[in-house]
Amino acid sequence: MKRTLIAGAATMLLAACGGAADAPGKTVQQFMAEDVQPTADIYWGAVRFESVLVDGQPVERDIRPETDEDWARVREAAAKLGEYGTELQRPGYAEGRGEDWMEFAQSLVEVSALAEQAAAQKDIDKVFEVGGTVYSVCKACHDVYPPASGIPGARPGDLETDAAG
């Protein structure tokens, strides 16, 4: 009898934990703004070309990872984007959205694997190219699920930004 009670209590405890694990700690907008976007910016910002004015003169710069630490940061950003794509497929984020939500999130997982591979190979051209594909995946999702559309789980103020920022 004692074993049955212990087993029953353990089963109930595990079931209760399972439900809590599916509930995200952030709205999708918060998750995007606080986690996904900054991580994507790290990847996108790793390889780029800039033309700026310095003392009225144009200065052109190729921005690219130079050290092993730089490349590790790019690779880590790519890996995190893949993890975030997986997270977006969890019921707490996917519930109430269409099947295309799952496809977009899975596309983020897949393109992030390519991004991670490009960074691991320290291939500047490939990092730049795959960055465009990451952008396309993000844009396709945002075209269907606009950030300010009142997606289930959004709260007023989730997307407010500082006008001076």
Question: Which residue stretches match the model-derived regions?
Answer:
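Bacterial N-terminal signal peptides that target proteins for export
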Residues: 1-8
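C-terminal motif of bacterial Sec signal peptides marking the signal peptidase cleavage site
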Residues: 14-16
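Sequence context surrounding c-type heme c attachment/ligation sites in exported
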Residues: 18-165
